[in-house]
Amino acid sequence: MTSAGEESQNQSHFTYMLLCSDDSIYTGYTTDLARRVQQHNAGQGARYTRGRRPVLLVHWEEYGTRSLAQQREYELKQLSHQEKVDLIARDQNRPAGGVRVPE
């Protein structure tokens, strides 16, 4: 039987950014990226995104531990809006316009 700590180590942890309908950028953390984006678009995500739907997934980073992902989430939240836009624009691994996850 695996402990909760070991299970967490085998799980992917994501830091992500969403482009909201008002052109603001929301940054969050999750272990299930597709589910979390769907929750945001269904109005069941963070309070911030509820009135700014639909949201578009425009950037994500995958980490092996929760602590690393949450540390990166904090770092991203410290960036200015323009710095976030620049990071998204430099992200060569994402399709242009991001990925819209169906509601």
Model-derived segments and spans:
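GIY-YIG nuclease catalytic motif and its immediate N-terminal context
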Residues: 1-56, 60-62, 67-82, 88-103
